[in-house]
Amino acid sequence: MGRTLYDKIWDEHVVHTEEDGTAILYIDRHLVHEVTSPQAFEGIRQAGRKVWRVSSIVATADHNTPTTGWERGYDGIEDPISKEQITTLDKNIAEVGAAAFFPFMSKRQGIVHVIGPENGATLPGMTVVCGDSHTSTHGAFGALAHGIGTSEVEHVMATQTLLAKKAKNMLIRVEGQVAPGVTAKDIVLAIIGKIGTAGGTGYTIEFAGPAIRALSMEGRMTVCNMAIEAGARAGLVAVDDKTIEYVKNRPLSPTGVEWDQAVAYWKTLHSDADAHFDTVVTLNGADIVPQVTWGTSPEMVLGVDASVPDPDKEKDPNKRSAIERALTYMALEPGKPLNDIFVDKVFIGSCTNSRIEDMREAAAVVKKLGRKVARNIKVAMVVPGSGLVKEQAEREGLDQVFKAAGFEWREPGCSMCLAMNADRLEPGERCASTSNRNFEGRQGAGGRTHLVSPAMAAAAAVHGHFVDIRKFA
């Protein structure tokens, strides 16, 4: 019987398997940031160990970095804990070393799941880990990538391996093509809406089908980024010419003969025709419309042309209770059209949607509409995912498009995705966000998050409420 893409990468990296299925898995790339690494470095130090393979580490500061005040340098980091975590990372990498380190305010600094791929740290066939749940992003390259906890960060540093049990295989196919105005973010939100946030639990998901193949590498990263929101620890897309072209000539990519050898191997990284999947889910791309989450879980999502659901129509008592709780927190009434939901803030950024394609997508909407940010919007911020994305966007004049319309053009970082830095929602504020989680308090205590694509967020900023972006596509 043939093997799935997941099977192939797993088999290449298993060092040993116990009778109960617990395996020792070799790790190729270890991505490190300032929040989940300090305890691991200290644990290594106290145990008198050394990092096993320094050349596997690529590090950056992202979660705590401010997106304003860079002219003040490290003094611009107002929160003392955030400042300590960032400076501690600097000290740890200075002591231990790394294949590459992009410190706060450096040209290539940015969100770890953006700077990894753009620097060639993520390559097809790799096993990639990071102390961050959205490490699944890197699966877009045909890599087995997933988040790990802080104790596991230390374990990988010490041994270059991880204890793991193999997951089951799930295939999600998106047939046909999507309509203009429907993006990778809409595709993955529609998938989560279909299978739920627990649908992928215990699985590694391979995303396939014509609509997935048609996506750029940046779009595929968006899809794999949110595999974790579907319950799967990892998501994958098979390697093709787009994958190989993207990683070519990146700083950490192989060159010369090693490049040729790598490409020959990478071209084998796809599921065999007779591979077995434990579960297969199919969606029709033509049925997917721009998505908006209405509740407090990514699975609470509907097309922008729909209305807030009525809990009284839900027969399952547990689901009914969840809907009622979500509507109370979100301050929404059943039956309210999503198009009629007004927002207070707009956030375009995060490891889901802060790459150059996302910047272009949002700027194109702003330019086409030819309007300024609506008067009811308190803040509309655009936060590029890295210094390189920011630089490229400014070369293309995208920053001027945003600023002319009243958006704030910020420095790179995780920003308002999570309430761990200065960018956050105040209690009761409602946000159109291109991030990946809409849990209670995710963007700030009492804040209300609606997940959308960059195009949808940009349109909401200038209209003041959600609109169907297909009207302007």
UniProtKB/Swiss-Prot annotation:
InterPro entries: 3-IsopropMal_deHydase_lsu, Acnase/IPM_dHydase_lsu_aba_1/3, Acoase/IPM_deHydtase_lsu_aba, Aconitase_4Fe-4S_BS, Aconitase_4Fe-4S_dom, IPM_dehydratase_rel_enz, IPMI_cat. The keyword Cytoplasm does not apply. Its EC number is 4.2.1.33. The keyword Lyase applies. It comes from the Bacteria. PROSITE patterns: ACONITASE_1 (PS00450), ACONITASE_2 (PS01244). Keywords: 4Fe-4S, Amino-acid biosynthesis, Branched-chain amino acid biosynthesis, Iron, Iron-sulfur, Leucine biosynthesis, Lyase, Metal-binding. It catalyses: (2R,3S)-3-isopropylmalate = (2S)-2-isopropylmalate. [4Fe-4S] cluster binds at C351, C414, C417. One of its GO terms (molecular function) is 4 iron, 4 sulfur cluster binding. Pfam families: Aconitase (PF00330). Catalyzes the isomerization between 2-isopropylmalate and 3-isopropylmalate, via the formation of 2-isopropylmaleate. Belongs to the aconitase/IPM isomerase family. LeuC type 1 subfamily. This is 3-isopropylmalate dehydratase large subunit. It comes from Paracidovorax citrulli (strain AAC00-1) (Acidovorax citrulli). The lineage of its organism: Bacteria, Pseudomonadati, Pseudomonadota, Betaproteobacteria, Burkholderiales.
